[in-house]
């Protein structure tokens, strides 16, 4: 019987998602049965986890590629093994937990605050300077990443989002405006790295139009990969690094 698994994603049909479809293709070449399970095509009932009208069966493994909610947790319960392990995954999808827990001699953490948009503007500026960056705790692909340049742009957070929403406020690293590094790590080994560059946006997300170019996997990057794996136990991950004055 072939090894069976689920990729947890947004939809069953991830037509334009290269990574998901490539994983399915490679699994098939290895005689593995890998199915994309979309959260928005799934519901959890007392009878089981139902996807497109069918109860999902237990499988050998799941690949977690969706961050939010509890449906993904129910799908993970059907598997013998989760990549990444669910407990660690649920912790480290949160940007605050990342800056609070992760450390290495090979990188620095920007100054940060956790709070809502009801914090006095002056108190944040006093701690972080101006401009500063506001980040949604579980956002991705550049969404909910805002550069706060003045009080008016800070007040837009309260206008555009619930006042109860927590934000990670970070100091603005000007040396990294419109550029950063993204490297990929598999069980503590850095396997690839790229530099992302944006024209006219402080964010360097490919989803927002940034260009990419190869970047060498340096000894420092290898150290970061090993340190983060030791601290998290995450099997695979993409790690973003800013350029700074010192590191």
What are these regions (language model features)?
Residues 67-69, 88-89, 189-190, 196, ...:
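Short glycine-enriched loops at secondary-structure junctions
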Residues 10-114:
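Conserved N-proximal alpha/beta basic substrate-recognition cap immediately N-terminal to
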Residues 27, 75-76, 102, 125, ...:
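A generic structural signal for well-ordered alpha-helical segments
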Residues 2-9, 56, 79-80, 87-178, ...:
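Active-site nucleotide/adenylate-binding loops and adjacent lid/helix of ATP-dependent enzymes
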Residues 114, 185-186, 243:
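Generic beta-strand structural signal
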Residues 143-231:
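Phosphate-binding site of ATP-dependent enzymes
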Residues 228-247:
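Conserved metal-phosphate-binding beta-hairpin within the catalytic cores
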């Amino acid at each position: 019987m072939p090894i069976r698994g689920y990729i947890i994603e947004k939809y069953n049909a991830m037509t334009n998602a290269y990574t998901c479809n490539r994983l399915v293709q490679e699994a098939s070449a290895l005689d593995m049965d890998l199915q994309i399970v979309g959260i928005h095509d799934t519901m959890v009932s007392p009878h089981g986890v139902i996807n497109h009208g069918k109860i999902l069966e237990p499988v050998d493994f799941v690949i977690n590629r969706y961050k939010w909610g509890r449906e993904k947790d129910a799908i993970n319960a059907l598997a013998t093994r989760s990549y990444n392990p669910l407990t660690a995954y649920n912790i480290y999808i949160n940007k605050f937990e990342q800056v609070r827990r992760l450390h290495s001699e090979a990188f620095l953490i920007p100054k940060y605050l956790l709070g809502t948009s009801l914090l006095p503007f002056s108190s944040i500026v006093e701690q972080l300077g101006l401009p500063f960056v506001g980040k949604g705790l579980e956002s991705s692909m550049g969404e909910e990443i805002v550069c706060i340049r003045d009080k008016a742009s800070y007040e837009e957070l309260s206008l555009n989002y619930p006042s109860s929403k927590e934000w990670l406020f970070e100091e603005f690293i000007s040396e990294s405006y419109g550029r950063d590094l993204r490297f990929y790590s598999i069980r503590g080994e850095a396997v690839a790295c790229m530099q992302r560059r944006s024209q006219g946006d402080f964010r360097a997300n490919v989803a927002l139009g940034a260009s990419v170019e190869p970047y060498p996997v340096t000894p420092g990057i290898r150290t970061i990969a090993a340190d983060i794996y030791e601290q998290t136990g995450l099997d695979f991950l993409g790690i973003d690094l800013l350029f700074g004055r010192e590191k």
